[in-house]
Amino acid sequence: MADVRADARVPAAHASAIGVGRSFKLVLSYDGTDFHGWQVQPAAPTIQGALLEAGRRFLGADVRVTGASRTDAGVHALRQTASLSTSASLDADAVRSALNAALPPAVRVLSAVAAPPGFDARRTALGKRYAYLIDTGAVAAPLWRRIAWHVPVSLDVAAMRTALAALSGRHDFSAFRAAAGSAAPPVCTVQALHVVRRRERLAILVSADRFLHHMVRNIVGSAVEIGRGAQRPEWLGEVLASRDRTQGGPTAPAHGLVLVRVRYPG
């Protein structure tokens, strides 16, 4: 990633627009394959870093960006939400166009609107939806290789649905958090869990008020064990009750995970 110059300036065509600071609500889509996640890291390409570089190039050095979800390396987003603040008083369409002109092709700003008072992409969110994509074909589909986990067996979708039903509602999800997870409270409310099959492709959709680190990927890894026939459907509820990560299945690879949307009031 190119260096972000501290003296970056808005192009002359927009120079007169600098004035009172503004905050924008951005909706982004990205292919996370070649990025080291959302959060800025030294000497590594990240989504937040790409947005900051693009913003500082066209909007000035004081640009700030906050994402609703700090997606991990390799994770994608269909509709991620971010807050962007700047002293450039451009309109929302100009901000979107300026960012897309400077962002790499794997990252696009789908929309930009003036943020309502007090809006913060992360703190204002009421919940998120993720999808995990699985390719069960005997031969991995080349067009899906960057966005789906290849599991070349016929998975028992009915058994997976039965198992996942035990996770709906408010629970302690310690058994599905990263082994070296943070000290964040482990209780989450899962509002919806679905398994959708289209021929050799599966999508596991999970909506919740909040998620623990690796929570979706750990749930999927365990659900696939049930789909393979390696575990009983009842086992998933037992893993949940154990609150012990070592009792669950493997962590599914990052590249099959997609942030579908972020939910806000109104």
Q: Where are these predicted regions, by residue range?
A:
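Structured-RNA-binding interfaces characteristic of tRNA pseudouridine synthases
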Residues: 1-266
